[in-house]
Amino acid sequence: MALVVQKYGGSSLESAERIRNVAERIVATKKAGNDVVVVCSAMGDTTDELLELAAAVNPVPPAREMDMLLTAGERISNALVAMAIESLGAEAQSFTGSQAGVLTTERHGNARIVDVTPGRVREALDEGKICIVAGFQGVNKETRDVTTLGRGGSDTTAVALAAALNADVCEIYSDVDGVYTADPRIVPNAQKLEKLSFEEMLELAAVGSKILVLRSVEYARAFNVPLRVRSSYSNDPGTLIAGSMEDIPVEEAVLTGVATDKSEAKVTVLGISDKPGEAAKVFRALADAEINIDMVLQNVSSVEDGTTDITFTCPRSDGRRAMEILKKLQVQGNWTNVLYDDQVGKVSLVGAGMKSHPGVTAEFMEALRDVNVNIELISTSEIRISVLIREDDLDAAARALHEQFQLGGEDEAVVYAGTGR
């Protein structure tokens, strides 16, 4: 008997009809001889609606109370799915994140899972029940306060539970039926991938793929939890994410796909003194404010005045805050200026095949040249090339790269709804 953890996104649970459809799938999995644990996101746009409601009551709501409010969304869908399963003649028991033993750090709004002690879930499984766990939430061990896990928290909940329960597979259900070589809404002939290594999926998640959040893939890799990305609208087996890139034979290594990201902003510090410790001051101030940095470029030092320019990208949502911090440092450091640009986007090519295929970088650059796309920043890893370009050029760049590396097929991809959640 296998133990299967299934996670259903908000689009899969946005109405009573879809909840019943999900319940039928869950019961079918149980009848096939599996133990089943289900992690639910909030229904449809419930989380956004709760955020709007909170803002109407208090423009700056306390973080603790916001977490109390937002976790209600998952508890609602949790109970409804359990009810739907019971109506089909199967036994189900729902759990909040804290009841399921999801223990987190104290940070409200973006807590991290530190441990999972799923004793009550195991007991219910031993009794033959289907266990339904509210995603996106946990509890801090010291304060006992409810916490939320941030964007994609339900994916992370599912993977963490799968690891703690030693599950055979963690299935992530949404409105897409797998991981594609590109976003089918941008590249219509994008092809679904049957299998990816953890490293390839980590790179795709890090550079903009919305199918799985980075934290969930990191967790899966750390605990070797096989992931399967599937659609709740079809019976297609989807994409399996498992194993290491090192296990892929050299002759089978390929280029995996193209991803785009519109969530970043570019910040440039002009005229900063080019001496030890100056760049460290910039990035320490941003780190203390918990602002993540992605791409970084430092220009060659000016011989005349001993200064240089530093350009980096950060989440657009943190861009204004980063500027406020750096403007204060500008006065202390006597920098020339600090510039902000949020009309940029990142396009990336990922694949284990880069290690064994010389010339990939040249072809990448030539493909963008041929569609008149200018490159502003470049970042690479062993299996990835990313460039920062104008946001308006992203779609054309993605299509050009997809065609250049022959990643497409003859048929158009099936898009059930399109959000990937």
From Swiss-Prot:
Phenotype upon changing residue 301 to Y: Feedback-resistant and enhanced expression of the asd gene
Coiled-coil ranges per UniProt: none
Reaction(s) catalysed (UniProt annotation): L-aspartate + ATP = 4-phospho-L-aspartate + ADP
GO CC list: cytosol
Pathway: Amino-acid biosynthesis; L-lysine biosynthesis via DAP pathway; (S)-tetrahydrodipicolinate from L-aspartate: step 1/4; Amino-acid biosynthesis; L-methionine biosynthesis via de novo pathway; L-homoserine from L-aspartate: step 1/3; Amino-acid biosynthesis; L-threonine biosynthesis; L-threonine from L-aspartate: step 1/5
Effect of residue 298 to A: Change in the inhibitory profile and absence of dimerization upon addition of threonine
UniProt-annotated binding residues for ATP: 7-10, 41, 174-175, 180-185, 210
Annotated site residue numbers, Contribution to the catalysis: 7, 74
Regulation: Feedback inhibition by lysine and threonine, but he enzyme is moderately inhibited by lysine alone, and threonine alone has no effect.
Family annotation (Pfam families): AA_kinase, ACT_9
Alphabetical keyword list: Amino-acid biosynthesis, ATP-binding, Diaminopimelate biosynthesis, Kinase, Lysine biosynthesis, Nucleotide-binding, Repeat, Transferase
Binding of substrate, residues: 25-30, 45-49, 74, 125-126, 151-154, 274-279, 292-294, 298, 360-361, 374-375, 381-382
EC annotation from Swiss-Prot or TrEMBL: 2.7.2.4
Domain ACT: 267-343, 349-421
GO molecular function, one term: aspartate kinase activity
GO biological process annotation, one example: threonine biosynthetic process
SUPFAM superfamilies: ACT-like, Carbamate kinase-like
Repeat recorded as keyword: yes
Assembly with partners or alone: Tetramer consisting of 2 isoforms Alpha (catalytic and regulation) and of a homodimer of 2 isoforms Beta (regulation). The dimerization of the beta isoforms is stabilized by the bonding of threonine.
Classification via PANTHER family: ASPARTATE KINASE, ASPARTOKINASE
Function: Catalyzes the phosphorylation of the beta-carboxyl group of aspartic acid with ATP to yield 4-phospho-L-aspartate, which is involved in the branched biosynthetic pathway leading to the biosynthesis of amino acids lysine, threonine, isoleucine and methionine.
Family under the similarity heading: Belongs to the aspartokinase family.
Name assigned to this protein: Aspartokinase
Organism: Corynebacterium glutamicum (strain ATCC 13032 / DSM 20300 / JCM 1318 / BCRC 11384 / CCUG 27702 / LMG 3730 / NBRC 12168 / NCIMB 10025 / NRRL B-2784 / 534)
Organism phylogeny: Bacteria, Bacillati, Actinomycetota, Actinomycetes, Mycobacteriales
Designated gene of the protein: lysC
